[in-house]
Amino acid sequence: MSRVRLEVCCGSADDVIQAHRAGADRVELNSDLFHGGLTPTLGELIVAKRETGMPIMTMVRPREGGFCYTAAEFDTAVEDAKLLLRHGADGLVFGFLHPDGTIDLERTRVLADLAREAGKESVFHRAIDVVPDWRKALDGLIALGITRVLTSGQEPDVALGTGTVREMI
């Protein structure tokens, strides 16, 4: 049986360094974890990568408060994603929804394609936990080539959503 990889959610370069020292296999780098995680600064990514050399997935989320973004917010996310990939990100973590709660496949495709073209991973984050039909959503993400999904099984706590997570796998 293969060993489970340990990925740690980090809010700073210091967090990444500590996770690396503690044996994490990879990290997800964010800023503002208090608000669910936002796009980290390039400086945090550069320092974390330089100090650890470990795989770093980076959150691409322009603001707190849901997963429906204006055109300008989405354009900001795209530009951030390009810069993060150019400066060492090993993948992008993101989630885009329509106002009705369904996945915005067009916007999701844009970031998935950016990651794929750079030879990196794309992870759809916990926005999947608020979609009305996770099965349909998951099928759409698979069709787009999304590498992984970050979920708590449509519950606030993964311990409560374990059954759904098992179904998703």
Q: Which role does the model predict for each range below?
A:
Residues 19, 84, 111, 125, ...:
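Conserved, mostly hydrophobic/aromatic
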Residues 1-27, 32-39:
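N-terminal pre-domain/capping segments
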Residues 2-12, 60-78, 97, 122-134:
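Active-site mouth loops of central-metabolism enzymes
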Residues 13-17, 33-57, 72-75, 96-116, ...:
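Active-site-adjacent beta->alpha loops and helix N-cap segments on the catalytic face
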